[in-house]
Amino acid sequence: MIKKISLLTALSVTAFSGWAQETDNNAMVVTANRFQQPVNSVLAPTTVVTREEIDRWQAKSLTDVMRRLPGVDIGQNGGLGQKSSLFIRGTNSSHVLVLIDGIRLNQAGISGSSDLSQIPLSLVQKVEYIRGSRSAVYGSDAIGGVVNIITTREKNGTTLNAGVGSKGYQSYDAATQQALGDSTTATLAGNYVYTKGFDVVAYGTASPAQPDRDGFMSKSLYGTVEHKFGDQFSGFLRGYGYDNRTDYDNFSSVDTRQLYSQTWDTGLRYQSGIYSTQLIGSYSHSKDYDYDPLRGLHSSGSTLVDSQQYNAQWGNVLQVGAGTVSAGVDWQDQIIKPDSTSVNREESQNNTGIYLTGQQRFASIVLEGSVRGDDQSEFGWHNTWRTGASWEFIEGYSLIASYGTAFKAPNMGQLYGRFGSNRDLQPEESKQWESGVEGLTGPVIWRVSGYRNDIDNLIDATGSTGYVYENVGKAKIKGIEATASFDTGPVGHRISYDYVDSRNAITDEPLARRAKQQVKYQLDWQVYDLDWSVTYQYLGSRYDKDYGNYIPAVDDYQTVKLGGVSLWDLAASYPVTSHLTVRGRIANLFDKDYETAYGYRTAGREYYLTGSYTF
């Protein structure tokens, strides 16, 4: 079930879930402060999505999961597998830190941002999603928020899934988790997804017609072994990889993207009484090809980004009084190999971070703080900090306030790429304020927050800079987020409203591809054994650029306005037996035609049917 943080729950006898139909006081999260704590004790707005909910919604991608959550706006160049941008509270997609099992996703490539459309949904067992700055906990990138993808399965057993759908969609996956003796657990899972896709049609004045199907195929494999060496020591070894192929329309050509990615993690954990510690090491390697399918993967016109990333973490947690303190060290090394067509030679950068976080409760007041220092090989030392507090001024009603700093380090392409790179770039920097109130009024659990985010030293390359990357930009973001949940008999309701005014602080123009207003509504209803789910989303109007229409007088591309749209999804599931469940979904029920990225169509109405067998 989804869990939306409600501060009053941390201070009240009864814990309520602002985003769940049922209450689970034992739900734990680790993302907010890098120590395990009840979901109802975190000050920052936090949402947890479980595998149970992903199955109930019958989501087909991680972007499909994220688009339903408060503060999230998705811009995507077409359908399943097409390039996507995740905007949290109006910030850039590169301002979102994506973790997999608490370890940074490999972002050593040229763009420096995470494309969630490429992460197989079959890997995802839980999502912990934090809104607001978290650089004082994790370092670079966490300006808009943090998304932590958990792959660990909660219980043993075997699951077989098969699904079909519109546009030639097929999905097959199998997973098993078994105990090997009293101390060892092993998990193995595999997945295959394919769709013929549709013509996403990149329109532009410089673009010819490209009548084709832009399909997607993904194959993934996952395995892990966990072992308990005793009551206090445990360890794990985990590996996963995926092979994705995406056909897409560029503004001047038909292209194919081929992405190979593999990751290996291992770690040791120790816990004794009020103290625990863990040491984790990780290695990931990805090869990202872009090529003309008529000429082949290794043709002269193809491009390759061959990147590696090494991570090491040592974290310590100590229970102190009515709270917890966490401290540790992170180390990361990113490498682009010399056979990459995006750089002239092998390039690397490394970062070492030291952090301290803590939370304490004093009667009706909760205080939280974190501080971190990062030593980066290119720009040196950078400090960040964050503090927050809540006060239950009346039983069941709380005031919350926080302030924090954050930063985003220049990515590898901006520092070392063949076009416009600049080794003298400095980090993008952010200052964020947030305040809010939440309460329980009758059956309704609600929260209203207002926030402001000022971002300086934004990196850009324009004609005025000679098309060389410079720290020349500024952004000013103001917003309001309101959430509520309540039950009416057997029906659960969850509603969120987002108002985001995200602007270029120099020109006062709206930032591209971000809707000013969004409304999201989720209804879950179980009638006898039939489980219904209705999802509504209103996407307000947004602005984008027509990259086929350059205007020299203003050194920019023409701005275009994309209209708003209302979308409905309908899903239902029925347990035929205690082992077999059949699910069906209609996405975009009323077949609305809309765009979240200019020139790129969306899928229209789609139908899906899935069978799941567990034993």
Curated annotation (Swiss-Prot):
Residues 155-615 form the TBDR beta-barrel domain. This is Vitamin B12 transporter BtuB. A motif (TonB box) lies at residues 26-33. One of its GO terms (cellular component) is pore complex. A motif (TonB C-terminal box) lies at residues 598-615. HAMAP family: BtuB. InterPro entries: B12_transptr_BtuB, Plug_dom, Plug_dom_sf, TonB-dep_rcpt-like, TonB-dep_rcpt_b-brl, TonB_rcpt_b-brl_sf, TonB_rcpt_CS. The lineage of its organism: Bacteria, Pseudomonadati, Pseudomonadota, Gammaproteobacteria, Enterobacterales. Residues 38-152 form the TBDR plug domain. Keywords: Calcium, Cell outer membrane, Ion transport, Membrane, Metal-binding, Porin, Signal, TonB box, Transmembrane, Transmembrane beta strand, Transport. The keyword Nuclease does not apply. Cyanocob(III)alamin binds at residues 85, 92, 110-111, 303, 513, 547. Residues 1-20 form the signal peptide. It is found in: Cell outer membrane. Ca(2+) 2 binds at residues 212, 214, 248-249, 255. It is a multi-pass membrane protein. The chain crosses the membrane at residues 158-165, 169-178, 184-195, 216-226, 231-247, 257-271, 273-290, 303-319, 322-331, 347-363, 365-375, 379-394, 397-411, 429-438, 444-453, 468-486, 490-505, 513-525, 531-546, 559-573, 586-597, 603-615. Its main location: membrane. The keyword Transmembrane applies. One of its GO terms (molecular function) is metal ion binding. Involved in the active translocation of vitamin B12 (cyanocobalamin) across the outer membrane to the periplasmic space. It derives its energy for transport by interacting with the trans-periplasmic membrane protein TonB. Ca(2+) 1 binds at residues 199, 210, 212, 214, 249. One of its GO terms (biological process) is monoatomic ion transport.
